[in-house]
């Protein structure tokens, strides 16, 4: 029987091999849709929260607001987002998805889902349930760890 250390090494190597294969496919899929990973992050944030200030997106992305402003320029040129003045402070600009932006976001997700479906088709239904449970647990652990690091001032 393998030791915990050997199992962790096996998992790490398998995940690395999987990500090295999937990542270029995901990037190519986004490129075909005319969206960069950073732009997808903005679209996803707006989809989830409805409307956000440039500063809020910058904080989530850990970049300067000027970087988000440039990205917003490109997304607005493509009619994927709309800018409006904040109702409480007219100096503040809020970003939101347009109908076209919502459609584009769903198209990008569909492309990513198709890639994942190809790989997940090798699993049985039981294995998919296990994989869903394990990855959700790992994602939750990562989020908890990130929040703890931020509280300690390490994030």
Curated annotation (Swiss-Prot):
The binding of MdtR to the mdtRP promoter region is severely inhibited by adding excess concentrations of fusidic acid or novobiocin but not by actinomycin or streptomycin. The keyword Membrane does not apply. This is HTH-type transcriptional repressor MdtR. Repressor of the multidrug resistance operon mdtRP. Acts by binding directly to the mdtRP promoter region, leading to the repression of its expression. Changing residue 83 to K: Significantly reduces binding affinity to DNA, resulting in derepression of mdtRP transcription. Disruption phenotype: The loss of the gene causes increased expression of mdtRP, low levels resistance to fusidic acid, and resistance to novobiocin, streptomycin and actinomycin. GO terms for molecular function: DNA binding; DNA-binding transcription factor activity. Residues 54-77 bind DNA. InterPro entries: HTH_MarR-typ, WH-like_DNA-bd_sf, WH_DNA-bd_sf. It comes from Bacillus subtilis (strain 168). Homodimer. It comes from the Bacteria. Keywords: Cytoplasm, DNA-binding, Repressor, Transcription, Transcription regulation. Induction: Part of the mdtRP (yusOP) operon. Negatively autoregulated. Induced by fusidic acid. The mdtRP expression is decreased during stationary phase, even in mdtR mutants. It is found in: Cytoplasm. SMART domains: HTH_MARR. Pfam families: MarR.
């Amino acid at each position: 029987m393998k030791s915990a250390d050997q199992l962790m090494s096996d998992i790490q190597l398998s995940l690395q091999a999987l990500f090295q294969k999937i990542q270029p496919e995901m990037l190519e899929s986004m490129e075909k849709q005319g969206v960069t990973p950073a732009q997808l992050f903005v679209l996803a944030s707006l989809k989830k929260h409805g409307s956000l200030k440039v500063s809020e997106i910058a904080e989530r992305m850990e970049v300067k607001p000027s970087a988000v402003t440039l990205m917003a320029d490109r997304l607005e040129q493509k009619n994927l987002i709309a800018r409006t003045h904040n109702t409480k402070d007219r100096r503040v600009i809020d970003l939101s998805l347009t109908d076209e932006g919502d459609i584009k976001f769903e198209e990008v997700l569909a492309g990513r889902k198709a890639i994942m479906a190809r790989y997940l088709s090798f699993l049985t239904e039981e294995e998919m349930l296990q994989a869903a449970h394990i990855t959700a647990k790992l994602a939750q652990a990562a989020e908890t760890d990130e929040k703890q690091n931020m509280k300690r001032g390490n994030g």
